């Protein structure tokens, strides 16, 4: 909704798809809530007493349950079996000295160029939070298998001596054994 003087208001609605009836209208959690991958529940995060809470909502009863009272920071997705959260965590890259700055490539002049994103896993049953990827390139979550066993993730490198400049790699990680299978590596323009 738009109000005078540029003010605005946002809200979310939960509707019964069969009847079109609005079950719940909310300007709070519904604006950020997402559906769980398997169960018929919504989830969202909020600030709690111990930190960020992961909360689930049963839309039929509106009952809210705190699934995790102190959630790690970062962007996450649920695995399809709803037992694990896979995070993308941004880490600050190395800093150069103030007297002499070594520019690795033209984009190195952009603030945050050396920052990297890595994939972490948070087990909802045990609370174990572990880093799955590391290195000098960003890693991106591409997909998770329906049985939640395999993670497809990718990396991207820049090569300025040939066109196209980017080289992409795609890997399959077995989340039980931690074995990696290379789908393709350093493929130009995929």
Regions found by a protein language model. Give the residues of each.
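A flexible loop/linker signature enriched in serine peptidases of the S9 family
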Residues: 1-13, 26-30, 45-55, 69-73, ...
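Short loop/turn segments that connect beta-strands within beta-propeller blades
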Residues: 16-20, 58-62, 123-127, 174-178
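Extended amphipathic secondary-structure runs
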Residues: 38, 122-152
């Amino acid at each position: 909704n738009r109000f005078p003087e540029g003010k605005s208001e946002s809200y979310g609605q939960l509707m019964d798809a069969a009847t079109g009836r609005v079950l719940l209208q909310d300007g709070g959690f519904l604006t950020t809530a997402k559906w769980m991958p398997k169960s018929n529940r919504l989830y969202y995060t909020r600030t709690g007493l111990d930190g960020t809470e992961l909360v689930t909502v049963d839309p039929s009863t509106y009952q809210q349950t705190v699934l995790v009272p102190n959630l790690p920071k970062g962007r996450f997705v649920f695995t399809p079996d709803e037992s694990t959260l896979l995070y993308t965590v941004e880490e600050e890259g190395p800093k150069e000295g103030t007297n002499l700055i070594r520019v690795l490539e033209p984009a190195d002049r952009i603030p945050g160029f050396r920052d990297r994103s890595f994939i972490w896993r948070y087990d909802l049953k045990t609370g174990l939070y572990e880093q799955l990827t590391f290195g000098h390139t960003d890693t991106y979550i591409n997909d998770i298998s329906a049985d939640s066993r395999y993670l497809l993730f990718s990396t991207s490198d820049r090569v300025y001596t040939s066109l196209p400049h980017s080289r992409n790699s795609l890997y399959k990680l077995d989340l039980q054994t931690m074995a990696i299978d290379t789908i393709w590596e350093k493929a130009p323009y995929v």
